[in-house]
Amino acid sequence: MTKVKICGLSTKEAVETAVSAGADYIGFVFAPSKRQVTLEEAAELAKLIPADVKKVGVFVSPSRVELLEAIDKVGLDLVQVHGQVADDLFENLPCASIQAVQVDGNGHVPNSQADYLLFDAPVAGSGQPFDWGQLDTTGLAQPFFIAGGLNEDNVVKAIQHFTPYAVDVSSGVETDGQKDHEKIRRFIERVKHGISGTK
């Protein structure tokens, strides 16, 4: 079954909702954005997450030192990196890694040392999907996440199109820029039970 990552959580209530609804991954954004949390805030929220739900730290062009500090302070299970990735960034990390790839039309998939790939829209967090026809995932060495403009109305179609390891959502479970607990529940329900579209 396709796994679910709910990203950009910053409150106790949102974390508890995502966990209770069946999220497999919880994402904390450490890169500058409206969803950014500090290491200290994430460490407190991480205490609410059971061991079978994985904690993911999201970074943009980080140094290896930044990754190691966050892994240690928050107890991250995975790091997700957007932007520039040094050749040795993922070597011998104490946790798994996800490299984000912006799907911009050239169809290029990088040769990555990361454990997972995540395919996102050209502007991450914009709520806009990329053109699914521009991405060919056949022959990929790594399992992959699909992100970029997913919501409760299109996520089942995305799963049918790509058969991904996991789907990732942030703005698609928000209302007026804040995490919407009902949207979180409905999104996860659609993924887990294959219910497509609104009635």
Curated annotation (Swiss-Prot):
It catalyses: N-(5-phospho-beta-D-ribosyl)anthranilate = 1-(2-carboxyphenylamino)-1-deoxy-D-ribulose 5-phosphate. InterPro entries: Aldolase_TIM, PRAI_dom, RibuloseP-bd_barrel, TrpF_fam. It is an enzyme of class 5 (isomerase). It holds the Pfam family PRAI. One of its GO terms (molecular function) is phosphoribosylanthranilate isomerase activity. It comes from the Bacteria. Keywords: Amino-acid biosynthesis, Aromatic amino acid biosynthesis, Isomerase, Tryptophan biosynthesis. Its EC number is 5.3.1.24. Pathway: Amino-acid biosynthesis; L-tryptophan biosynthesis; L-tryptophan from chorismate: step 3/5. NCBIfam families: PRK01222.1-7. PANTHER family: N-(5'-PHOSPHORIBOSYL)ANTHRANILATE ISOMERASE (PTHR42894:SF1). Belongs to the TrpF family. This is N-(5'-phosphoribosyl)anthranilate isomerase. It comes from Streptococcus pneumoniae serotype 4 (strain ATCC BAA-334 / TIGR4).
